[in-house]
Every structure is written in C-alpha cells, then in structure tokens.
C-alpha cells in the first residue's frame, strides 16, 4: 500500500513541476528568441558582435530544434555550419582557439545562406504569432544604438 501512495505522490509532484515550468519554457523561449533577433536581424549590429553570439544561436537551435520551421535542406546546411564552426573552434594555435582571421569567411558564408534563412524563419514565426509589439518592430534598433547613431 505504501508503494502505491508513494508512486501517486511522485506522479502528483511531477505533474505540478511540469505545470509550473510550462510558463517558464514559453517566457524563456520568447526572451531568448527576442535576444537573438535583436542581434542577428538588426542591421545596426556589427559582424563582430554577431560572431561572438554564434554559440548562443547554436544553443538556441539545439534547445528548441522544432520551434523554427526550416526545410530539411536548410536544417542540414545549418547542421553543417555548426559542425564547421565547432571544427574551427577546436583547432588550437599555441593551445588557444583562433582569435579571428579566416573565421570571418565562415561567418560570411553562414550569414549569406543558412543563417539568414534561420533568422528570417525565426522572425516570421514571431510575426505570425503576434505575441508582442516588439515582434513587428524587431528591426528597430535598441535605444542605446539609436542614441549612438544620432551622435555620429
């Protein structure tokens, strides 16, 4: 009898935890997606900032693999980019990963093909859902960047 009661309590506990974390997943997803859109879909953000955030984009892709609609070909190309990126970062020069140089070529190839489609799919999905006002204005730069461009 004790086994059944403890099993029931565990099931109830897991149900409560799952229910409580359901809203967290959605808000975490939205925050992460908005962050990436503000970086990769913003023409005012330079390439070096985008390059530094590629690991964040890859983490997002792995954390939410089915959330962004991609064709099978685009998904394969993105997986190939991730593989190439990791191989590039794995190469050590004097015990340290490369600090620039030819990586711009990999990044340029990524932005020109797969990355643009992935970010546009991410942006279009957000626009279709119509979840927030920022979704329709994601190409507007953040206030700090607007301020900096006014000073120039």
Curated annotation (Swiss-Prot):
Q: Is Translocase among this UniProt entry's keywords?
A: no
Q: Where is the signal peptide?
A: 1-22
- Top-level taxon of the source organism: Eukaryota
Q: Which GO terms describe its biological process?
A: cellular response to heat; cellular response to oxidative stress; innate immune response; response to bacterium; response to heat; response to oxidative stress
Q: Which InterPro entries match?
A: Turandot
UniProt keywords, alphabetically? Immunity, Innate immunity, Secreted, Signal
Major subcellular site: secreted
Function in brief = A humoral factor that may play a role in stress tolerance.
Q: Would you identify the family this protein belongs to, as annotated?
A: Belongs to the Turandot family.
What protein does this entry describe? Answer: Protein Turandot X
Q: Look up and give the organism this protein is from.
A: Drosophila erecta (Fruit fly)
């Amino acid at each position: 009898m004790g086994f059944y009661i403890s099993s029931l309590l565990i099931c109830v506990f897991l149900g409560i935890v799952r229910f409580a974390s359901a809203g967290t997943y959605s808000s975490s997803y939205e925050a992460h997606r908005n962050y990436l859109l503000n970086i990769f879909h913003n023409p005012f953000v330079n390439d070096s900032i985008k390059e530094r955030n590629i690991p964040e984009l890859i983490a997002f892709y792995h954390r939410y693999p089915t959330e962004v609609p991609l064709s099978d070909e685009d998904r394969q190309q993105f997986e190939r980019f991730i593989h190439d990126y990791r191989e590039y970062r794995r190469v050590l020069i004097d015990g340290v990963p490369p600090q620039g140089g030819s990586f711009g070529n990999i990044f340029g190839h990524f932005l020109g093909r797969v990355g643009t489609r992935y970010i546009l799919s991410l942006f279009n999905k957000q626009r279709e859902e119509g979840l927030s006002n920022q979704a329709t204005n994601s190409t507007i730069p953040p206030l700090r960047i607007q301020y900096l461009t006014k000073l120039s």
